[in-house]
């Protein structure tokens, strides 16, 4: 082989390795009003330090890129994840509905009509509703640092948009979408790394914080939706904007999964799907040999609350613990790659069978739950998450509570569907009925408060507090507060995005079109957006259920094999 050809081959192989890195990165999200979708990318916001500069007394935890004598010997200092947030008792007599400063700052950009013109009067209506929602959130969450939210109001065919006939997250939904603007990797007490939303990291008062994005939450709203702004008559097909904003802000604060469904092409099963969180891989050398290893498994802070079993006595570990136990042991020598690829392509292997079973369980309702820890909340032994979509939908699965369990119950807000023509107040009245003890929390139900606390937010104790929600409920007679859910047309708050599945006989191509991430070291769908995706349940809990290899890993292995082959000539 000529030197020119060999050089070209090596360059081609090296290009396949783009996206593989030994560093931790923050995950950022911005909204592209031309494509009407969120753009995901990574940014280097966590400082990297050299091994010789390690300070054992420094705040945080050092994560090594490689174990033993593997090179490079870079280390990174990850901030420590917060402990469970506190429950803050308040003076119930003085804690009036206007006693708390609004800790939410909204930056609105509004584009209306086909020319994308601004309408200050109409945009102000959005702002007024958002400020009211921010005030209520500020009464529930005990915040010490303001949370900045960028909100884009844009239609399906506005200004620079591609006018794509409903394609795009915002255009395809009545509400829109929301994501943390930046997610920061943090070292948790269980030895795992998880992505935490910037909004909660800012509350920790870190002495050496990572770099922060300009905003904490990014929200996009569909300007073509028939929004109700809280005054006048509400049409039977209108959508209460306050409801939508409460829902989207909750996603942006961290109520979203880092798990996604992945399809990768292999030789014998081109449409096999697998479920996994963000997985980083590294390539290095040890004793002169090229090595391929998992860098880390990184799920969202939200995912720490998710369990397979609805029986806490089984003591099953969390999703990440299953996967991490396998990933930590998965280190390949270069000469082993061909055999591993062949094994993954063999449909008779346990790996293939278990990955298939994992996907099946992910579309089985009632398998995935949030367990409140003892002392966090005693509201319920567990909270059902939504895993009812067949095929799996990264637009609605897991980042919402089960639809029919909570249609007239205090956790109603995080259902994936909204009843047209129903006001937020009608949902609250239905959820609480004659029980006014906790109605001051309004739409921020116990499931949300539990998740917020597990991520590190402090929550005010509003039991027995009087505010506009309790006052409104008190004005009605018991006969006017039936435990019946609002009726009307059911509208999806987020577009239902379907991934091709080996279980879906109607599809014959592998589509992961919703994966807008351009991350450099991970495989992930648009996991943290309000239309975030989901995960599976398994009462048996076999680690192999989650040891599912993404296309990124396949590319890594293939690229490594390519480089080895090139070096032989």
Curated annotation (Swiss-Prot):
Residues 498-541 are annotated as: Disordered. Residues 505-540 have a biased composition (Low complexity). The keyword Transmembrane does not apply. It is found in: Secreted; Cell surface. It comes from the Eukaryota. Residues 1-22 form the signal peptide. Keywords: Secreted, Signal. Its main location: secreted. GO terms for cellular component: external side of plasma membrane; extracellular region. This is Uncharacterized protein PB7E8.01.
């Amino acid at each position: 082989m000529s030197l020119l050809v060999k050089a070209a081959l090596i360059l081609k192989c090296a290009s396949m390795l783009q996206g593989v890195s030994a560093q931790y990165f923050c995950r950022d999200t911005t909204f592209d009003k031309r494509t009407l979708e969120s753009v995901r990318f990574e940014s280097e916001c966590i400082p990297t330090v050299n091994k010789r500069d390690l300070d054992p007394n420094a705040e945080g935890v050092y994560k090594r890129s490689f174990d033993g004598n593997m090179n490079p010997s870079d280390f990174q200092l990850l901030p420590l994840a917060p402990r469970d947030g506190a429950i803050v008792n308040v003076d119930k007599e003085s804690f009036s509905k206007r006693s708390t400063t609004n800790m939410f700052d909204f930056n609105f950009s509004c584009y209306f009509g086909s020319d994308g013109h601004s309408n200050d009067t109409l945009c102000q209506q959005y702002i007024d509703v958002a400020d009211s929602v921010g005030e209520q959130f500020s009464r529930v969450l005990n915040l010490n640092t303001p949370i900045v939210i960028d909100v884009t109001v844009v239609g399906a065919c506005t200004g620079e948009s591609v006018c794509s006939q409903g394609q795009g997250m915002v255009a395809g939904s009545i509400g829109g979408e929301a994501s943390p603007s930046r997610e920061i990797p943090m070292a948790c007490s269980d030895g795992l790394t998880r992505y935490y939303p910037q909004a909660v990291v800012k509350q920790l008062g870190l002495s050496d914080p990572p770099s922060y994005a300009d905003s904490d939450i990014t929200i996009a709203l569909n300007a073509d939706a028939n929004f109700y702004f809280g005054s006048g008559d509400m049409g039977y097909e209108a959508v209460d904007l306050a409801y939508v904003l409460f829902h989207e802000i909750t996603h942006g604060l961290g109520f979203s999964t880092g798990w996604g469904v992945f399809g990768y092409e292999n030789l014998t099963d081109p449409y096999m799907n697998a479920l996994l969180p963000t997985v980083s891989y590294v390539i290095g050398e040890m004793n002169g040999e090229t090595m391929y290893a998992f860098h880390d498994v990184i799920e969202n802070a939200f995912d720490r609350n998710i369990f397979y079993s609805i029986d806490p006595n089984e003591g099953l570990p969390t999703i990440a613990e299953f996967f991490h136990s396998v990933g930590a042991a998965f280190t390949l020598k270069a000469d082993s790659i061909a055999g591993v690829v062949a094994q993954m392509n063999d449909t008779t292997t346990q790996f293939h069978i278990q990955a298939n079973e994992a996907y099946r369980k992910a579309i089985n309702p009632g398998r995935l739950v949030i367990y409140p820890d003892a002392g966090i909340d005693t509201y319920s032994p567990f909270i059902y998450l939504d895993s009812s979509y067949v095929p799996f939908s990264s637009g609605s699965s897991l980042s919402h509570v089960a639809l029919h369990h909570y249609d007239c119950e205090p956790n109603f807000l995080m259902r994936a569907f909204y009843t047209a023509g129903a006001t937020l107040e009608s949902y609250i009245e239905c959820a609480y009925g004659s029980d006014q003890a906790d109605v001051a929390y309004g739409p921020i139900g116990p499931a949300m408060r539990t998740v917020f606390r597990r991520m590190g937010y402090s929550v005010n104790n509003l039991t027995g507090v009087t505010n506009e929600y309790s006052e409104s409920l008190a004005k009605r007679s018991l006969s006017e507060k039936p435990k019946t859910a609002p009726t009307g047309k059911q509208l999806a708050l987020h577009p239902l995005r379907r991934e091709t599945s080996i279980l879906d006989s109607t599809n014959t191509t592998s589509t992961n079109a919703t994966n807008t991430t351009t991350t450099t070291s991970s495989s992930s769908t648009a996991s943290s957006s309000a239309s975030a995706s989901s995960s599976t349940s398994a009462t048996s809990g076999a680690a192999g259920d989650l040891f599912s290899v993404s296309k990124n890993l396949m590319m890594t292995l293939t690229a490594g094999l390519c480089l080895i082959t090139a070096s032989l000539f």
